[in-house]
UniProtKB/Swiss-Prot annotation:
Belongs to the universal ribosomal protein uL10 family. PROSITE patterns: RIBOSOMAL_L10 (PS01109). Forms part of the ribosomal stalk, playing a central role in the interaction of the ribosome with GTP-bound translation factors. One of its GO terms (cellular component) is large ribosomal subunit. NCBIfam families: PRK00099.1-1. Keywords: Ribonucleoprotein, Ribosomal protein, RNA-binding, rRNA-binding. This is Large ribosomal subunit protein uL10. The keyword Cell inner membrane does not apply. CDD domains: Ribosomal_L10. PANTHER family: 39S RIBOSOMAL PROTEIN L10, MITOCHONDRIAL. The keyword Ribosomal protein applies. One of its GO terms (biological process) is translation. Part of the ribosomal stalk of the 50S ribosomal subunit. The N-terminus interacts with L11 and the large rRNA to form the base of the stalk. The C-terminus forms an elongated spine to which L12 dimers bind in a sequential fashion forming a multimeric L10(L12)X complex. The gene is rplJ.
Amino acid sequence: MSGIIEKKKQVVEEIAEKFRASQTAVVVDYRGLDVAEVTALRKELREAGIEFKVYKNTMTRRAVEAVELTDLNDTLTGPTAIAFSNDDVVAPARILNNFKKDHEALEIKGGVIEGQVATLDQIKDLADLPNYEGMVSMLLSVLQAPVRNFAYVTKAVAEQKEEQGA
């Protein structure tokens, strides 16, 4: 009997460690998806470096209490899977939200963003953000625009001076 309890404690500690280490964890209800759809979702998440796991709700509740994210307990009902991302904050929310558009059976319940419990609306807002590279390129284009405009103006002034001088 104690061997089973030890295994369960290890699973609880594994879940708790995943919550501690992850930038984002998104909790979903996968009820209504067939095996092929779940396999396709797992593949898409795996390609993005996201771990997608199904744990018993009771063990997940204990892990959530261990990492002091008890507000997440409300989402731990019914069939629950969790997508953990250690690197990209946006990717799990974006991939799951896009998958949900094609497969309405998938239900996003909530999650954790950088150690804080997030609501469904916050997860959806996060899904609408571009990834890191997209945000960097947007920032660079915003920073580059004034310099480019200044260059156009100075070129126009130089051309105007040339025309007046000639």
